[in-house]
């Protein structure tokens, strides 16, 4: 579904991604784990067009994403739950969800999808007229996920959805990710919480200083001494 | 010269009684409301543009001036009435605003804020002196035929049809603006872009298009204000945008730059303050007081009356 091939990305003079390649198969949860600053967020930003690679290709269903305007990439079926949630704080919960469906013209179905989001996240329904900035961290994360779902994505890019959340909430969020995937949405999940990420993924990549250093099934990676030492606290 | 001063010749004999003092006060308030409505409309454009691209568009007052001239020619050459003149001016300036953003500001979007600010000042001078070059530096008298003055005496208060026209049309425009910002998809997209441009892009919102729309709306409001200035002061000239533009900027800062309701309130406060200073003090001080407000607000509460003290957003 998505092939990232040997991309090189720079932040000014910093060589952030070095010939990074990865592949996401339709219907799967693929996770990209690694330490802070390894290049996980950069990878997602490059896929969604916010950053451009100087070389390499990103192909999604046969389309070269590096030549598509970032705001058009959403229309191809890719939506993102950005790092740090990035909800529109001075706008209401409902308005945030409407923004998620910005490109959709089917008003009735948008309305239905909003009801589905509220079914999935009853807390958001209670607070639908509240400003997003007044929500708790967990609720904001749910809103960010709900907002991404409103685009009816086929591929969802999730950037550290567990960041800053209490352990119980983290569990809940990962349950939700699994559930979204089981309903047919492919997921590329970036996480520092390697343990949780590996527990739900079908395939995993380990990124270190801008390059993939390991890849394989979560079971394989969990057994790997390197991964244990560096990411699983063993 | 402010008409506010002319209106000071109250149509009743001041007998130093409390009633007269009250009446005079209310009269000043009415005069201040018209001027404030004009400042508020200009301030809205400043604040909307700042909210979305963090740029003080110093050419904004001059866009108002262009609006006044379009209105003037619409009345004198095309023979339209004042409402049509205002609509023409709004359309013309909406286009002008979009073109200015595209030509002058968009290429600088990634650069420093000071570069964009200097460009805005350059654009301001360009509009002023291009108008002088094309139309001459003389002031033009806004045709009385387009707006025959009527005065109403309500319980001792002198209200002109100019005041009514300005206040009513400003309020209507503000209601329409609020509707667009709060209720329409475009307005929500404008807010989303101003809160977090990158997140907005991830929603599929076109930042360029949204910024263009913001300039179009802000410039159209300035154009409406320009026609109102023509009606209010009777004369227009190519440099008429400078002082009202600066005062509207103060109004926007007073309300909290980037905050739409703040610009409205700030505009009315500035207008009322100015007429009170002219009425009770001396009109010589009115500009000094206006800019004194700017200094005070920057010293005491730089985020403005409606601003939250969050510091610079990063």
Feature map (PLM): residue ranges:
Chain B
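Membrane-interfacial amphipathic/re-entrant helices at transmembrane-helix boundaries
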Residues: 5-42, 70, 82-85, 111-116, ...
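Helix-loop-helix "hairpin" substructures at the membrane interface of multi-pass membrane proteins
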Residues: 35, 157-236, 260-265
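Alpha-helical transmembrane segments within multi-pass membrane transporters and channels
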Residues: 79-123, 130, 265-270, 301-302
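Transmembrane helix-bundle core of multi-pass membrane transporters
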Residues: 107-108, 112-183, 210, 276, ...
């Amino acid at each position: 579904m998505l092939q990232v091939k040997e991309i090189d990305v720079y932040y000014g003079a910093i060589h952030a991604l070095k010939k990074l390649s990865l592949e996401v198969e339709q219907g799967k949860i693929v996770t990209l784990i690694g330490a802070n600053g390894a290049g996980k967020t950069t990878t997602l930003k490059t896929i969604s067009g916010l950053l451009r690679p100087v070389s390499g290709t990103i192909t999604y269903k046969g389309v070269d994403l590096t030549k598509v305007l970032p705001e058009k990439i959403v229309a191809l079926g890719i939506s993102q739950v950005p790092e740090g949630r990035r909800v529109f704080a001075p706008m209401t919960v409902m308005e945030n969800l409407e923004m998620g469906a910005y490109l959709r013209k089917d008003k009735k179905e948008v309305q239905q999808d909003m009801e589905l989001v509220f079914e999935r996240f009853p807390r958001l329904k209670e607070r639908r007229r509240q400003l997003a900035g007044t929500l708790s961290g967990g609720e904001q994360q749910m809103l960010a996920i709900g907002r991404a779902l409103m685009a009816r994505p086929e591929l969802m890019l999730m950037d550290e959805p567990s960041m800053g959340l209490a352990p119980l909430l983290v569990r809940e969020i990962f349950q939700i990710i699994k559930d979204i995937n089981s309903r047919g949405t492919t997921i590329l999940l970036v996480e520092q919480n390697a343990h949780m990420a590996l527990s739900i993924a079908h395939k995993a990549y380990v990124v270190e200083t801008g390059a993939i250093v390991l890849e394989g099934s979560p079971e394989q990676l969990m057994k790997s001494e390197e991964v244990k030492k560096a990411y699983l606290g063993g | 010269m402010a008409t506010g001063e002319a209106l000071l010749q109250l149509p009743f004999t001041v007998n130093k009684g409390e009633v007269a003092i009250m009446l005079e006060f209310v009269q000043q308030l009415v005069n201040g409301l018209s001027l404030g409505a004009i400042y508020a409309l200009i301030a809205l454009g400043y604040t909307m543009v700042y909210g979305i691209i963090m740029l003080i568009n110093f050419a904004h007052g001059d866009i108002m001036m262009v609006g006044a001239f379009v209105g003037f020619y619409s009345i004198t050459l095309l023979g339209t009435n004042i409402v049509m003149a205002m609509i023409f001016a709004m359309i013309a300036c909406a286009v002008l605003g979009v073109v200015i953003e595209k030509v002058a500001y968009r290429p600088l979007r990634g650069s420093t804020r000071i570069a964009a600010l200097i460009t805005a000042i350059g654009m301001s001078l360009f509009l002023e002196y291009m108008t002088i070059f094309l139309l001459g530096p003389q002031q033009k008298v806004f045709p009385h035929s387009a707006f025959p003055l009527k005065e109403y005496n309500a319980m001792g208060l002198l209200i002109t049809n100019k005041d009514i026209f300005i206040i009513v049309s400003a309020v209507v425009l503000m209601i329409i603006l609020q509707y667009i910002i709060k209720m329409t998809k475009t307005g929500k997209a404008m807010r989303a872009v101003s809160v977090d441009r990158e997140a907005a892009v991830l929603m599929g919102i076109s930042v360029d298009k949204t910024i263009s729309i913001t300039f179009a709306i802000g410039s159209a409001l300035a154009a409406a204000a320009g026609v109102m200035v023509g009606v209010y002061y009777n004369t227009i000239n190519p440099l008429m945008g400078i002082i009202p533009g600066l005062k509207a900027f103060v109004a926007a800062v007073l309300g909290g730059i980037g905050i739409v309701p703040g610009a409205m309130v700030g505009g009315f406060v500035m207008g009322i303050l100015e007429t009170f200073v002219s009425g009770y003090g001396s009109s010589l001080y009115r500009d000094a007081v206006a800019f004194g407000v700017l200094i005070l607000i920057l010293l005491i509460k730089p985020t403005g009356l409606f601003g939250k003290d969050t510091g610079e957003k990063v």
